[in-house]
Amino acid sequence: MTAILERRDSENLWGRFCNWITTTENRLYIGWFGVLMIPTLLTATSVFIIAFIAAPPVDIDGIREPVSGSLLYGNNIISGAIIPTSAVIGLHFYPIWEAASVDEWLYNGGPYELIVLHFLLGVACYMGREWELSFRLGMRPWIVVAYSAPVAAATAVFLIYPIGQGSFSDGMPLGISGTFNFMIVFQAEHNILMHPFHMLGVAGVFGGSLFSAMHGSLVTSSLIRETTENESANEGYRFGQEEETYNIVAAHGYFGRLIFQYASFNNSRSLHFFLAAWPVVGIWFTALGISTMAFNLNGFNFNQSVVDSQGRVINTWADIINRANLGMEVMHERNAHNFPLDLAAVDAPSISG
């Protein structure tokens, strides 16, 4: 009888735990994806903060020339970063127990791999948690679809690109100036500005900003006034009210006359779908572009493509970009190789006896 009661109590405990995890009545929804999301994101955040403050220099290029990235080693908020894992490690899984000592693990940039892998797992679980909560509330799944765009972009620069290039040392550093360095080197090696998918991403981001500003300003300009002139117009809205808060007909008429009739949406639902889809599709294409360039399927190269009748080159802006790319590549990893790969016309001499 005692054994039966104990089993029933344990079943009730597990049932209560399951209900607590999956209930939508909590202040913050946890969900089964949240069970994995919380520890992974906490780990990534904690290690990032500690490493950004106190991590020793990392031998990123594997040539015994460590690069400093933490605040205690001379950096500030702008120049500081988590330095990517050393080229010596390549794509190997490099947890702390794989190193001979913690000092060796830090010298080879172990924290970067730890942070990136936990972060990617965490944001993927956050995406799953969005789907889980939408499902339990009976909502449509478009929130998780929209969030998949930044998740795809982060996965591209932190995981797909290092895999394609053969080393986590080619991943994006976790810092402000490190991000800019990554962008410059990426342009030098892959000519990303001339890649159609990057162009679509630029159109998505800037177009999304434009459409968001246009929509917000139109709505704000066509609010249905519910207050006096001495009160804020925002006081005329009550959360959950059934009435429209702005006049979509007036906004439609204004915008249609400002540009032309069919440039303005007359359906609020299709309008908001468009506002969500435009930047999401653009960022999807950017992530896809990064993933293809990871395997060196690079942007267009129109180098010296325009010549006159005598065969002389007429420089175009594409040639200016190519020249800038060579200059940036020369500055990159200046001690790891003497010349950019584009200028290395002959094979290196053999050094074997």
Curated annotation (Swiss-Prot):
Give binding positions for Fe cation. Answer: 215, 272
Question: Which residue positions hold the site described Stabilizes free radical intermediate?
Answer: 190
What are the recorded Gene Ontology BP terms? photosynthetic electron transport in photosystem II; response to herbicide
Residues at which pheophytin a binds: 126
Cofactor note (record)? The D1/D2 heterodimer binds P680, chlorophylls that are the primary electron donor of PSII, and subsequent electron acceptors. It shares a non-heme iron and each subunit binds pheophytin, quinone, additional chlorophylls, carotenoids and lipids. D1 provides most of the ligands for the Mn4-Ca-O5 cluster of the oxygen-evolving complex (OEC). There is also a Cl(-1) ion associated with D1 and D2, which is required for oxygen evolution. The PSII complex binds additional chlorophylls, carotenoids and specific lipids.
PTM-bearing positions, type N-acetylthreonine = 2
Provide GO CC annotations from the record: chloroplast thylakoid membrane; photosystem II
User: One GO molecular-function annotation for this sequence?
Assistant: iron ion binding
Residues binding chlorophyll a PD1 are 198
The protein's enzyme class = oxidoreductase
**Residues that bind chlorophyll a ChlzD1, according to the entry?**
118
Q: Provide the protein's localization.
A: Plastid, Chloroplast thylakoid membrane
Q: Subunit composition?
A: PSII is composed of 1 copy each of membrane proteins PsbA, PsbB, PsbC, PsbD, PsbE, PsbF, PsbH, PsbI, PsbJ, PsbK, PsbL, PsbM, PsbT, PsbX, PsbY, PsbZ, Psb30/Ycf12, at least 3 peripheral proteins of the oxygen-evolving complex and a large number of cofactors. It forms dimeric complexes.
Miscellaneous comment as given in the Swiss-Prot or TrEMBL entry? 2 of the reaction center chlorophylls (ChlD1 and ChlD2) are entirely coordinated by water. Herbicides such as atrazine, BNT, diuron or ioxynil bind in the Q(B) binding site and block subsequent electron transfer.
Q: What is this protein called?
A: Photosystem II protein D1
User: From which organism does this entry originate?
Assistant: Vicia faba (Broad bean)
